[in-house]
Amino acid sequence: MSKVKTPDKTKNSNSVNWILFCLFVVVLYFQTNLADPFNSPKSWALHLIAAWLIGHLVSALKYFVESKQLILIVAFFILSALIVSVFSDLKHVAFFGDTQRRNGFFSYMALGIIFIASARFIRFKDMKKFYSLISTISFVTIIYGTMQTLGRDFVNWNNPHNALIGTLGNPNFSAAVMAIMATLLLSSFFFVEFSKLQRFYSIVGAVILIVLIYRSGARQGLLAFAAGIMSFFIILAFRKNKTMGVAALSLSVTLVAFSILGMLQIGPFERFLYKPSVTVRGFYWKAGIEMFKDNPILGIGMDRYGYYFNQYREVEYPLRYGFEITSSNAHNTFIQFFATGGILLGISYLALNLFIIKCAIVFFRNNNGPNRLVFASIFSAWVSFHAQSLVSIDNLGVSIWGWILGGTLCGLSIANSSNEQSSGSPKKQLINLKQTGFSAIPTLLISLIVVFQIQGEARTFQAGADFIPQNNQSVQLFQEVQSKVINTPLIDPNYRLRSAENLIRTGRTDEGLGVIKDIHKKDPRNEMALVSLSTYYESIGDFSSAIQYREKIMVLNPWNAKNLLLLGKDYKALGNTNKSVEILKLISSFSTGVNGAPILEQAQKELS
């Protein structure tokens, strides 16, 4: 008979509290006095808590004997992300993530740590605590979401989207999180060990969340909820009997088929499910696939999708949506990983998710007790997470759910297979110096990085304030803030660019121009820097220099008719009519439709 493991409940409880606190903060925390009020603070919280949990994991190494496969798969993912980041052309984006995304190496390493911690520490005895947290987060989300949808938001957001952006800054992300929580709440109604009040809130909370998803206009949220809750009811049906399970599965497959057809403007569900944004995702996916095909080993670079999209997008995209509209993500997590990290990162992420599915199957085969229903609830929420990840961005406030839920599924399955049990009586402990030391060192190192990032975000926010052009003191203060932004260590390159443009605008031309050239030197694919440089040289009549940068833009963004028009005008200003006519022919070859025809008409007037 195998020895039964009895992990210390005091240690586990403390570790679980940190994991749940991470979920709470990463989902709900935002800070309005930052340039990026949502993604940056969430990434800091994620990095710091993950760093602290390292000590907890080091103290629990002896319990990983039955989890070797899990550790190897997560390590493979983290190592793949590190290799891709090291070989990426722009290290800042690779390690810290792109502007207003923050999906760099440090974020994925932190998510990997959270995954392992969830697998190691979260057990069925923690489920009441877990679902209480879900109720708390959902309650806050309901209150704030209702305020937003009624026009009572206490923050005056500069928001081009639906008002219901929640605590994640985007209605699609908010709807995704609400779908996951609605799945967890509605499925927990079937937990007989929950009180009547808890089960009542499960129903009411889930219904309100579904209403808010509908009010957000994010159809993907409804589909994610449907996928999750259907998974739960299929498992519930199979638990009753096989015939009922097969019937539920058949019905679900039929509904999924009609839903997909509806999204494609076919069938009775079209009026409910089709949105133009569904079609646009096809362009994002195709571009990502082409990036992977051209860069199969290491991809284009960690979180670098936005710097390559304009080069890989089909000509129909700008003609439909505008020449200056772009995307910084493939809107499909798997395609995103393959595009940015090549086969190395893509396969490692795919392997991780297949391992989660394997763990779930093993648990369902070997356990038919009361815990099966709880496991089914968590699995269904994980399905809901992945349903939205197939059509959306890997946002940290959403991603944290997938990694915690996935890790929990693996941990519960492995513990069930190895007969792990909790000790009957927890020991009182003094401070664990080993754990504290291994937690404090990485946390301190991450804190030093976070301090600089907070400075950069806060200064960039201040740099966006207005100034009085006629007041020399006001202009000088404005310029000083811009210089502080530019000189902040670890500052986002695009924040530096913005402040450099402000310096040029207020007369400190040489300094601002030097910064933009430095940005271009470090990242030749930064199209915004190229636009700034070409625009500046056009403004002073140096058309030869402007042409150099416009031609670089043409390589990175070949279907941008607006850039081509300006390039043609620069050639004409230098008297090179042959080149301007050549540019006119190029514009004429594709620039049609609502967005293209006006540019073509203008080009025919100015370049012929």
Language-model-detected regions and their locations in the chain:
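Helix-loop-helix junctions and helix-breaking kinks within/between transmembrane helices
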Residues: 36-42, 145, 169-172, 203-235, ...
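Transmembrane signal-anchor hairpin modules in multi-pass inner-membrane enzymes, especially those
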Residues: 1-103, 111-136, 188-203, 230-253, ...
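A membrane-periplasm/extracellular boundary helix in multi-pass inner-membrane enzymes
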Residues: 124, 148-152, 211-216, 221-225, ...
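TPR alpha-solenoid repeat register
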Residues: 495, 529, 563, 596-598
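Transmembrane alpha-helices of multi-pass inner-membrane enzymes
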Residues: 23-27, 46-54, 224, 228-232, ...
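A conserved mid-to-late transmembrane alpha helix and its immediate loop/hinge
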Residues: 170, 210, 289, 319-358
